[in-house]
Amino acid sequence: GSGIGHPGSYYGEWGYGHIKGQKIRAVPDLEKYHGTDTFLSEALTIEANREITKAVEEKRPFYLNMAHYAVHSPFQADKRFLSRYTDPDKNEQARAFATLIEGMDKSLGDIMDQLEKLEIAENTLILFLGDNGGDAPLGDERGYGSSAPLRGKKGTEFEGGMRVPFIAAWAKPEKKSKVQKNLPIEVGSMQTQLGTIMDIYPTVLSVAGCEVPQNYVIDGFDLKKQLSGKVDKKRPESFLMHFPHAHRGSYFTTYRMGDWKLIYYYLPETPKQPKALLYNLKDDPEERNELSSAHPDKCREMIQEMSAQLEKEGALYPVDKQGNELKPFVYF
């Protein structure tokens, strides 16, 4: 990726950011496309298919990590699709965002077509996911935008800021395939058990039949059982997200335990803002009904458990003006 993680530009005419004032964001390599009208998503797809073809010709397995940059800002229109998005009620950035989505969709389709052409689709597992919550130029940061009905955007404490799409599928489903029998994925099935991006590494190792290097610490869980439609009873039904610094949703920790979710604020933005919010995600995935007053015992339990988890991980905390750590506490 670029030095700052997102492109200076999606346009080949602009060298994907190799222009004055954008060098830190410039996409490396791809010089052959500089000065052309090749959109970044298309250039990456061409190169990805080239590498896949090379691996097949050399008769070696491959792992492709295809990071499109899309749909990250800057929201620049992919002109191949712009004529389809003319709604005058949507702003220019929203229309550009729609073209980025379609360009990413076409990219995935082109790669799948290449797998089919090379006759390796039955043996190729595709994992499609986001790396953070939605950030489309729609709605406000703590409201409802492209992640609707989930609330919030990237970097916020709400579900729209941390949940991401995750799709696992064989490029060409075939029940008779020996490879797919090792990991049967039912077409159209849905898994509701918790999973995280940290699970990708151990899952890929498992599917590929590779052993974890000795003394190597693995943070995630193998998803094979969950991808097969089963429940992994060994997996804890908890998730801790610690955000002790300034950004959009500043100085908070969220802790999920089963269906319950706690949001704890170290530095509330206003005197009236509560330090803790409690939601039941099973009944209220949109986080509209705050329950800390209705369930004070559950709120206290969650704060205590969250604090224990933070201490176990050696977490850092925000500090006040005197330099004192602002550790969470049960305050009601």
Model region roles, listed by residue range:
Residues 2-3, 65-76, 128-136, 219-220, ...:
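Short, solvent-exposed turn/loop segments enriched in Gly/Ser/Thr/Pro and often Arg
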Residues 61, 67-68, 103-142:
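Metal-dependent active-site segment of extracytoplasmic phospho-/sulfohydrolases and closely related
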Residues 57-64, 120-126, 162-164, 235-236, ...:
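Loop/turn elements at helix/coil->beta-strand transitions in domains of secreted/extracellular proteins
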Residues 1-62, 68-77, 95-98, 179-181:
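Formylglycine-dependent
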Residues 134-157, 169, 173-193, 198-281, ...:
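C-terminal cap/loop subdomain of S1 sulfatases and analogous C-terminal strand-loop tails that border
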Residues 62-67, 101, 108, 125-130, ...:
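Beta-strand elements within well-structured catalytic alpha/beta cores of enzymes
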Residues 200, 257, 267-275, 281-332:
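Long, internal low-complexity/basic segments
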Residues 6-10, 74-81, 137-146, 178-180, ...:
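Short, solvent-exposed loop/turn and secondary-structure capping segments
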